Amino acid sequence: MLKWVSQFDEDDRLFVLKQTDLLLKKQYFTKDNFEILLDNAIKDTASKTLHDTSFLDVQLDGKSQSDMLEILNNSCLNTHNFPININNYTKNRFVYQDDVVFTGDRVCRDLEEWIIHSAPHQCSLLIASLYTHTSALYNIEKNLIQTINISGKSISLSLVCFGKIYENKFIMRNQSDVFWPKEENVNIPNNLDPIRFISTAPQGQAPGRTGFAASYVFENGNDRDRFEKILCEKGCYIISLCNNPAASMKPLGYKTYRGLGFGGTIFTYRNCPNNTPLVFWWGNPNMEDWNPLSKWYPLMMRKTY
């Protein structure tokens, strides 16, 4: 922790430590947190319903889904004395379970493929997460309904979140639960192309926050402004270390669209999501000195797949 915070300006270090401590106490989720949510879901579901349901193991990238299925299976064995069904196409009720959903893009990629090529002609599909974001729910529903219509199949779609839904809609940006700086708090250095960081917004509206309203994650407006400013500055510095940074690499976390990044505020025992600000996870102290990854010491080094 001390090595990580020493990379910030001296006047900011104590503030960054305090804000990071507040954030992680609220937003770092352990395996116990996951198990409690999934165990409650299993206990609240009738045995017959579980017998008639198949969970999907169709994630194209990563291991989060298989990890969630392992927890669900253990819970079902302990509660109902039988294992869950996985990829069982004799059923017509399916559940896609994941841990944290940020943009919903991965969910859509996985399920668009499944709907077109593997789903029965008639079935129900429940998309379940432990933590998610309001925009992700909108994106998933919109995109998958379109895919279902294209497929010509009769698939009823529903979404559920067992934990908390975090606010990140544009219209609610002043009280969002993700990092979303005011424009005046953002200073893109001259050595970076500013175009990639300019967010799109409806005509006549500012892309950044225009004020502050308390949210679940952010309770103090001045602290939020200062923390976001610091995270942007250091995130831009990290990007400047790279010779050819990916277009999706943004100071506040990876995002395919233009802007400063997703600004995620959720961290888990499994990994540090790349949708969170770069300062938390980018870098690798095990790399040789010539490698840009050696130039920043991460607080939570990310596991890649």
Region annotations inferred by a language model:
Residues S54-L56, F94-V95:
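Conserved beta-strand elements of the Class I
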Residues E112-W114:
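Glycine-rich, phosphate-binding/catalytic loops in enzymes
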Residues M1-T53, D61-G62, I116-Y305:
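PRPP-dependent phosphoribosyltransferase catalytic core
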Residues H80-N92:
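Short acidic low-complexity segments
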Residues Q97-R106:
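Ser/Thr-glycine-rich phosphate-binding loops at phosphate-binding pockets of nucleotides
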Residues E70-H80:
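Short helix-loop-beta junction
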Residues D105-D110, L137-E141:
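A short secondary-structure junction signal
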Residues V58-L72:
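Short, charged N-terminal beta->alpha structural module
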